[in-house]
């Protein structure tokens, strides 16, 4: 239900963003705990196995964007420094209640952490401070504007 609302209010159907790490894991901020093969993956900004949420995925899109080696190094430098930080429920509340500083690094909402990584690595231009939230649909727009290609896969529900 929450995922549907995020996609709806985000204007594109996207409700979450993860990034493939060089080790083949998916990295992102989640509010829920996952148990896979006896391993517990807590809520927060962490790496999870590629199949961690297969039972709940209705559709996914893989974006591919060419960046420089320096940008890639900066992306992972910032991302690695955020590992283990808690999930930020204010990201969802921002859809309804408005202004907040989404760049506050104490906790992360998935799309806002991704945006911060990309801004730090100069992949995306820095957004104006007047914008008080970034949702997964915003990330899709930014990626396409930067020249990303994409492949969308649909699943039967």
Predicted segments, located by residue:
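Small-side-chain structural scaffolding
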Residues: 18, 28-31, 75, 79, ...
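Active-site-adjacent helix/loop patches that line small-molecule binding or acyl-intermediate pockets
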Residues: 54-97, 108-111, 115-116
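A structural signal for the main folded, soluble domain(s) of proteins
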Residues: 16-23, 84-90, 129-130, 142
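Glycine-rich catalytic cores of cysteine/serine-nucleophile enzymes that process amide/ester linkages
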Residues: 1-66, 93-102
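General structural signal for secondary-structure boundaries
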Residues: 35-52, 68-71, 88, 127-128, ...
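Activation targets extended, charge/polar-rich intrinsically disordered C-terminal tails
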Residues: 92-157
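Hydrophobic/aromatic-lined pockets within catalytic cores
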Residues: 22, 83-84, 118-123
């Amino acid at each position: 239900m929450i995922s549907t609302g995020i996609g709806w209010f985000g204007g594109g159907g996207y409700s979450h963003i993860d990034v493939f790490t060089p080790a083949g894991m998916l990295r992102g901020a989640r509010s829920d705990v996952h148990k896979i093969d006896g391993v517990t993956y807590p809520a927060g900004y962490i790496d999870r196995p590629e199949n961690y949420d297969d039972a709940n995925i209705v559709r996914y899109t893989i974006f591919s964007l060419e960046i420089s080696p320096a940008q890639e190094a900066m992306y992972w430098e910032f991302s690695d420094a955020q590992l283990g930080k808690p999930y930020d429920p204010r990201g969802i509340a921002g859809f309804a209640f408005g202004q907040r500083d989404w760049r506050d690094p104490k906790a992360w909402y998935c799309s806002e952490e991704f945006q911060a990584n990309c801004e730090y690595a100069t992949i995306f231009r820095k957004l104006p401070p007047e914008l008080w939230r970034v949702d997964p649909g915003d990330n899709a727009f930014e990626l396409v504007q930067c020249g990303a290609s994409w492949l969308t896969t649909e699943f039967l529900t």
